[in-house]
Amino acid sequence: MTSLIFKNVTMSYPIYNAHSQSLRNQLVRVSTGGRIGGSRGEVVTVTALDNISFELNSGDSVGLIGHNGAGKSTLLRTMAGIYPASSGEIIREGSVATVFELGAGMDPELSGYENIMRMLLLLGNSVASAKSKIPEIEEFCELGDFLVLPVRTYSSGMTMRLMFAVATSMRPEILLIDEMFGTGDAAFQEKAEKRMRDWIAGSDIFVFASHDRSLIKKLCNRIFRLEHGLIYEESMDIL
């Protein structure tokens, strides 16, 4: 059975050359998403995730909420295995696909078609499987002749269309999305939302970080609120 389990997970990272009090004050002021720990010489330690535990199983669709810098993106990347935990245990049972920052995994000098193949192969597809997915991705993203052009010529909305189409063509057991719906025109957002509904209906675990609470209410059945590296499960009634 698909599952994603965090047991007392902490993720800390050092900030080097933090030799001045002004830098320390700046770190606090911009809110890193965690806590600023004690400095060791010229190193300041930031605890982005602080001893958090939860369990996700098949059927869980989780909305992550919290202010900018609360730790949502850090949590998603730790879920995906991009960031290693400093301590604690993470158990992942199931394949993972992500939609994070614009252009992640893409080569801007390659065409849309070439990037589709590149991303699908990076996600573990065979060449034959990747080629079989191209027509459906092409139809969904609606980029037409732009797919033969370098991705560096794309707008941010076009790039997100392509990334989203590739990620959701995979049908992974676990899908992690960071603020995906904030980019793109209204028509594509509506189309993407419908695709997500269809995906969730037949999926295992879905985790979505967003400031759009109305969209979280439509797509999710659990709410995690992050604040200064800590996690709290909230009732859906807060939306």
UniProtKB/Swiss-Prot annotation:
Subcellular localization(s) per the UniProt record: Cell inner membrane
Domain ABC transporter residue range list: 28-239
Keywords: ATP-binding, Cell inner membrane, Cell membrane, Membrane, Nucleotide-binding, Polysaccharide transport, Sugar transport, Transport
Protein function: May form an ATP-driven O-antigen export apparatus, in association with RfbD.
Topology in membrane: Peripheral membrane protein
Family, per entry: Belongs to the ABC transporter superfamily.
GO CC annotations on file: plasma membrane
Gene Ontology biological-process annotations: polysaccharide transport
Superkingdom to which the source organism belongs: Bacteria
Binding site for ATP: G66, H67, N68, G69, A70, G71, K72, S73
MF terms (GO), sorted A to Z: ABC-type transporter activity; ATP binding; ATP hydrolysis activity
Designated name of the protein: O-antigen export system ATP-binding protein RfbE
Main location: membrane
